[in-house]
A protein has these predicted regions:
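Fe-S-dependent hydro-lyases/dehydratases of central metabolism
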Residues: 1-218
């Protein structure tokens, strides 16, 4: 299972790769992924990096066997928090209507992953290359149906039960729950359509590098 906290919600018609990770002043940091990631969405959602880092820190605590109060509250909204804590990973997510327009900039996806990004949610991807980059970095490329309202906000959380099994079984329709900041819970149907077998295995392995490492080891 995974739970993705919405660290950025962008309702512009299109979100470009230059908005996801600006060019120019960032070019000197291309060999420093941690420093480069500090610029993610800096021109569009300045709060994104801090929010994503906070979620990543809480996930690190969960991995150590702790259960931060925020994560406990999220899990309590959908079930037994103590039972779910051991099987639910937490990460950040970005919603944008149509992300990835512009140059084929790998860092537009890799910087999200460096900050603990688990998922993107959109109506469609502007380019196949950006979607592929997300997959190669282990970011779940969710879509929702055109016309489905997405009136959620930064800080709301998307809980996706059995997502690993859904990817393994090539399911394209994946029911999820959205836990709003006020504690209310709503259903949301997510989709991951058109994944190849290799793409599914890349996501399951965590990223393209892990995918190749596993096959070299075999």
């Amino acid at each position: 299972m995974c739970s993705s906290d919405l660290a950025a919600v962008i309702h512009d018609p299109v979100t470009t790769t230059d908005e996801l990770i600006p060019s120019g002043e960032t070019s000197s940091y291309r060999s420093n992924p941690l420093r480069l990631a500090e610029f993610t969405l800096s021109r569009r959602v300045p709060e994104y990096v801090g929010h994503a880092k906070d979620i990543a820190a809480q996930e690190a605590e969960r991995r150590e066997g702790k259960l931060p109060e925020y994560l406990k509250a999220v899990l309590s909204a959908v079930g037994d928090a103590a039972a779910l804590a051991g099987t639910t990973q937490f990460g950040s997510a970005v919603f944008a209507n149509k992300p990835g327009d512009g140059s084929a900039r790998e860092q537009a996806a890799s910087c999200q992953k460096v900050l603990g990004g688990f998922a993107n949610i959109c109506y469609s991807y502007a380019t196949k290359r950006y979607r592929s980059n997300c997959i190669n970095w282990g970011i779940l490329p969710f879509t929702i149906d055109e016309g489905t309202p997405f009136d959620y906000a930064d800080g709301d959380c998307v809980f996706v039960p059995d997502v690993r099994r859904a990817v393994e079984e090539a399911r394209e329709d994946i029911p999820a729950k959205v836990i709003r900041k006020d504690g209310s819970v709503e259903d949301l149907m997510l989709h991951i359509r058109g994944l190849t077998q290799d793409e599914r295995e890349i996501i399951l392995d965590g990223c393209l590098m892990n995918y190749y490492a596993a096959r070299i080891a075999d």
